[in-house]
């Protein structure tokens, strides 16, 4: 790849962001935000798809496909502990799964 100005800026900003999140407290806060955003997305998808019952099966299939692809990428590859993107995506998936689990409890009661 050519060393253009844009390529250099993106590379430097990525390194600065990676350096910024090396701090354990920032990493924990990013993980917590990812989990809460996943929880919000799962609840929003469940309630939106539940309003129009035609999309229930399609949304469930997409969420299942997303979760399985994240699992395959995260666990098969042997992700290192320092891989922030994989860790944040896996925690987002946990938030989505947990929110759907709680939505099922709400519907069952």
Curated annotation (Swiss-Prot):
InterPro entries: Uncharacterised_Ycf20 (IPR007572). Pfam families: DUF565. Coiled coil: none annotated. Belongs to the ycf20 family. This is Ycf20-like protein. It comes from Synechocystis sp. (strain ATCC 27184 / PCC 6803 / Kazusa).
């Amino acid at each position: 790849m050519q060393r253009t100005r844009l390529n250099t800026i993106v590379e430097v900003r990525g390194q600065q962001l990676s350096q910024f999140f090396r701090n354990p407290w920032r990493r924990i806060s990013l993980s917590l935000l990812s989990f809460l955003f996943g929880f919000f997305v799962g609840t929003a998808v469940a309630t939106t798809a539940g309003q129009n019952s035609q999309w229930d099966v399609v949304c469930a299939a997409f969420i299942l496909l997303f979760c399985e692809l994240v699992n395959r990428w995260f666990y098969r590859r042997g992700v290192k502990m320092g891989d922030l993107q994989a860790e944040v995506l896996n925690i987002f998936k946990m938030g989505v799964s947990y929110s759907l689990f709680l939505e099922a409890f709400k519907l069952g009661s």
